[in-house]
Amino acid sequence: SEHIDEVLEQIRKDIEVRGPLSSQDFDFDKKVGWYWAPAKASRAALESMYWWGELVVHHRAGTRKYYDLAGRHIPQDIFDRLDPNTTEEAYHRWHISRRIDSIGLFWSRSGDAWLGIKGLNSAKRTAAIEEMVRSGELIELEIEGFDYPVYTSSVNRELLDRSHESTGAPEASFIAPLDNLLWDRKFIKSLFQFEYTWEVYKRPQDRKYGYYVLPVLFGREFVARFEPVFDKKKRVLNIKNWWWEEGVVVTEDMKEAIRKCTDDFAGFLGAEKIAT
């Protein structure tokens, strides 16, 4: 953006002289188109400089990020190292491996989890994954009742072998809306028959469930979703709403696992009481 380019040099100079700064420390009037909504040129410039490696996040004050020059915190020899990926193909294999490792296992179909990998399209992704399977870097798996192959890192082979063994009663987990597992909603819907939308950015009247709703995983199934509200002053975790998924048979093991998970969640938040 032209407006971002106009402020880059001033931002560099100010951070060099004054140390870590946030977007609020710059008096630029202009706004730029930026992802979900227009943003101040200072914020867009700081985020851009962070993404290309010129700045680091030094600290936060609440939700506000303070940026500093990367060279003050990262040794120069790291900056001087050559890119290990000398070809586009090598870069794509490296980035595909990172994405699959981040999720655990994943398919090769187009979707949100593949966004942001420079130059990668469907044909290149397919070719890269096939080569990674041939070389032994990835393992191709078939899931009973699932129409598409999925892939995981070869380092997970032992874990896959152990997954056939009985491990006792299933456990419950609350999944954060931006958890890697939920990156690709189409994948989750196809694999688990679980449809999830993060409704934070929807108007209240347009929401099906709630503002901040967490999926509940029990064993290998998504069995519910709920809306937690944490009262920081009273240190109370309020379970505002709870929705069981259609067809779920609620058992004592399931309820006990969810109770334990809720206690753990409350402890993580610092809640002293749970209210339903």
Language model features: what each stretch is:
Residues S1-S173, D179-N180, F187, F194-W198, ...:
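Long, low-complexity intrinsically disordered regions
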